Design a protein with these regions (language model features):
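Structural recognition of the beta-strand scaffold that forms the well-ordered cores
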Residues: 127-131, 136, 181-185, 228-233, ...
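Active-site segments of SGNH/GDSL-like serine hydrolases
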Residues: 233-238, 266-302
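N-terminal secretory targeting modules
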Residues: 1-131, 135-165, 353
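A structural motif corresponding to the C-terminal end of an alpha-helix
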Residues: 169-180, 269-283, 304-311
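Solvent-exposed, polar/charged alpha-helical surfaces in well-ordered, non-transmembrane soluble domains
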Residues: 167, 171, 175, 220, ...
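Conserved SGNH/GDSL esterase-like catalytic core that processes O-acyl groups on lipids
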Residues: 21-23, 152-255, 292-298, 330
Length: 353
């Protein structure tokens, strides 16, 4: 009766299914006027005190029309109303997480309605898997970035209220295609390089349900899901960590950051993860350039794509730089719309849509 989206896990100790990653969530079809759930919310502290979800009713696509904000529950279960006051009849409701895996998580124990649950609807035929960081997760995408005269100043206001994965380039791309999508990653995560004290990168923890959970305790089953296409937009934090911390930033083997080393890391990740888990017929798109446009990451991705000759289709997409990129800022909605259109056009070409 329930469709789920994204990497999730069930825990009998927690008494429910945990939704932790950006764009993860559930979808139900029911006959009735309201939908309620029994949940627990774990939050990321005072700056991120709530769970934040977009609710889509009967095919709605506006991720800001219905925002569900759940309160941190301190280990207790709360009964929340997801939607109410609907016209009597059949409805489809999708509840998807706006925020990344290091901010909050929702544990759902029960879903009910004042009518009856029906068989879940068919999922979209196109499904995109994204490996990314804050750019993909839409951190700060809704923040103010212009002064009263229209000059770009960038407020750099990164809170749960200014995050929305559905208005990142990934979300805009999926909306253009009518596709489902999932995200593995979160703000600040790197592909390969890390500073002392940071245990995880995407490369060393991709077999976990979420990038900050140990894969020994939270293993992910790659056989449970097969996307239509895989998008990798990583490397920004590898470069930024190196820029800030210099030679203390190394990979798991102690090698210092270099653009050549990052190229090798991209090639190895695509081969060892996407190729081995899904096969070399899986289309792969490597993205760059919304942030730090002078870092040479577009060249890294282009060079990596050229080396991945085992695959039937690997393309590199360098986006137009974001409007706040020269001030070190994250992409905003206008950037996401342009980049999302660029990527969705590329996916249409790749998949023959």
């Amino acid at each position: 009766y329930v469709n789920t989206y994204g990497r999730i896990f069930y825990s009998s100790d927690l008494g429910g299914v945990t939704f932790i990653n950006s764009a993860s969530g559930f979808e139900v079809r029911f006959r009735g006027t309201e939908l309620v759930a029994e949940v627990q919310t774990l939050s990321g502290g005072t700056k991120y005190p709530n769970g934040m979800f977009s609710v889509f009713v009967d095919g709605e696509t506006d991720s800001n029309a219905r925002i569900l904000k759940t309160e941190a529950s301190g280990g207790l279960r709360d009964k929340i109303t997801i939607v109410s006051g609907l016209n009597e009849g059949e409805h489809t409701v999708k509840v998807l997480k706006r925020t990344p895996s290091n901010r909050d998580r929702l544990i759902v124990s029960e879903i009910s309605t004042d009518g009856e649950l029906l068989t879940a609807p068919a999922k979209p035929s196109v499904d995109i898997e994204f490996y990314g960081d804050s750019i993909t997760c839409g951190e700060g995408v809704l923040r103010e970035y212009k002064d009263e005269n229209g000059n770009i100043v960038d407020s750099a206001l990164y809170t749960q209220e200014t995050q929305n994965v559905f208005q990142s380039y990934a979300g805009e791309c999926a909306k253009n295609l009518g596709a489902a999508f999932r995200v593995f990653g979160r703000g600040g995560i790197a592909l390969k390089y890390r500073k002392a004290g940071d245990p995880y990168t995407v490369s060393n923890n991709y077999e976990s349900v979420a990038v900050d959970l140990p894969n020994s305790d939270y293993p992910y089953d790659y056989n449970s899901y097969r996307p239509s296409v895989v998008v990798v937009y990583l490397g920004t934090n590898d470069y930024l960590l190196y820029s800030k911390h210099g030679s203390t930033v190394v990979d798991d083997d102690g090698n210092r950051y270099s653009s050549g080393g990052l190229t090798v890391a991209v090639v190895n990740f695509v081969k060892d993860v996407i190729g081995q888990k899904y096969g070399y017929d899986m289309p792969v798109i490597l993205c760059s350039n919304l942030m730090v446009p002078n870092a040479g990451l577009d060249k890294v991705m282009t060079n990596a794509a050229a080396q991945l000759t085992e695959f039937e289709c690997v393309r590199a997409v360098g986006f137009k730089k974001g409007v706040t990129a020269d001030k070190g800022g994250h992409p905003v909605v206008e950037d996401s719309i342009v980049a999302g259109k660029r990527l969705s056009d590329e996916i249409k070409s790749v998949l023959g849509l």
